[in-house]
Curated annotation (Swiss-Prot):
Highest rank taxon of the organism: Eukaryota
Principal location: cytoplasm
Cellular component aspect of the GO annotation: cytoplasm; cytosol; nucleus
Name by which UniProt lists this protein: Meiotically up-regulated gene 125 protein
Upper taxonomic lineage: Eukaryota, Fungi, Dikarya, Ascomycota, Taphrinomycotina
Location(s), subcellular: Cytoplasm; Nucleus
Function: Has a role in meiosis.
Alphabetical GO biological process terms: meiotic cell cycle
UniProtKB keywords: Cytoplasm, Meiosis, Nucleus
Species in which this protein is naturally found: Schizosaccharomyces pombe (strain 972 / ATCC 24843)
Amino acid sequence: MILKDSLEAKSCFKSSQTSHLAARVAMENPQKGNVINAQSSRQPSSENEFRENLFFKEMRTNGKNEHETSCRSVVLYRNSKSAKRYPLSTKCARISYMQGNKDTKTALTKKYKSNEDVSRMRKKGNKYPQCKSKNLYDSLKLEECIESWSLNQKQNENFYEHTHLNSRDDSNPSSCDRETFFLSDEDSEISLMEGLSSIENGYPDEKETLAALDNVKLSDENAAHLGYLVKYFQNYTDKIILKETLMDWEDKEPSLQELTESTKYLENLADTDHRTSNKPFLFLR
């Protein structure tokens, strides 16, 4: 599916301060090969392809403009054989991607405003959509649920991105209109659609609820907290954000204000990977 060049996916960079950091991490050219990038020969799983096709099919069917959907920005993998585009909501700073080591993946705990904890269970080798209903997980094979189930992306008032699995049959007791679910990737590679979790709620930290950063002010306290999140992310993923991704690409490390407020800075950085002379991503606005 190829979108026309005239596509304008309205971006929310300026209203989501941590989205800049998320996009930088997404652009990182990993040495371990655990993130799908322009040089990767692996293709996204069939589940993700199904999600993408359904997303754009729904967009066309409903006659919605791009800026009226949950797709706030579109990421294009250059040199991809299928020239796929992936919705990436910049309202939700999705940077805590998992290491693709084919080991059992840690459940991510998401904190709802109602103080309801929901875990995203990522199990080794699990290729089925999972739906939580009355503490039971109903696994459905993809090919069996295409006709009877639909996937929708929605956002709640906290700007946490939710993925809902809704049944077209109202009498189906396993209909999930509040619970999140995921589609795992066979190769434990990351999908920008599903694998990138929110910086504000994506870490498996049971001792502390990480604060949402939509309202971060550039105070010393909040700057220190953002630094803590970055350090936590680096320890968790074994990847360096500032040293590896930014300082090697630029003459100087950007200030926190540049990091969180400058859309132009982000787009310039996104345009070219200065270490490889590649242009791995194209951000459409």
